[in-house]
Amino acid sequence: METCQMSRSPRERLLLLLLLLLLVPWGTGPASGVALPLAGVFSLRAPGRAWAGLGSPLSRRSLALADDAAFRERARLLAALERRRWLDSYMQKLLLLDAP
């Protein structure tokens, strides 16, 4: 199955980038961190080495880094949800105050 790639104009690329910036919840608190781990964190194969077994220090380190990245991502998403709930309740209060 072949994938069809469409060339995008610079304007379309800019619009996609702006949309991405608006959709991604950028956290500023201590729970926010790197959303994606560095390349190779999930890989059990080290560059230039044979396959790392599941009990090797390399695989344990990779799993620990992946677990840490997942924990940070979850904390960041929970903080974003909490901010959204607070903003929704605040906007609802403002709507009730402005009601005639």
UniProtKB/Swiss-Prot annotation:
Tissue pattern of expression reads:
Expressed in testis and, less abundantly, in liver and kidney. Expressed in seminiferous tubuli and several brain regions, including nucleus ruber, caudal paralemniscal nucleus, nucleus centralis pontis, and nucleus subparafascicularis thalami. Expressed in neurons of cerebral cortex and subcortical areas. Expressed in Purkinje cells of cerebellum.
Annotated Gene Ontology cellular components are:
extracellular region
Subunit-level organization: Ligand of high affinity for the PTH2 receptor (PTH2R).
Miscellaneous section: The N-terminal truncation of tuberoinfundibular peptide of 39 residues [TIP39(7-39)] reverses PTH2R/PTHR1 binding selectivity, then is a highly potent and selective antagonist for PTHR1.
Q: What is this protein called?
A: Tuberoinfundibular peptide of 39 residues
Q: Which residues form the propeptide?
A: 31-59
Q: In the record, what terms sit under GO molecular function? A: signaling receptor binding
Set out the biological process GO terms recorded for this chain's protein.
cAMP biosynthetic process; neuropeptide signaling pathway
Indicate where this protein resides in the cell. Answer: Secreted
| Known function | Plays a role as a potent and selective agonist of PTH2R resulting in adenyl cyclase activation and intracellular calcium levels elevation. Induces protein kinase C beta activation, recruitment of beta-arrestin and PTH2R internalization. May inhibit cell proliferation via its action of PTH2R activation. Neuropeptide which may also have a role in spermatogenesis. May activate nociceptors and nociceptive circuits.
**Family according to the record:** Belongs to the parathyroid hormone family.
Swiss-Prot/TrEMBL keywords: Cleavage on pair of basic residues, Neuropeptide, Secreted, Signal
Signal peptide: which range, if any? 1-30
Matching Pfam families: TIP39 (PF14980)
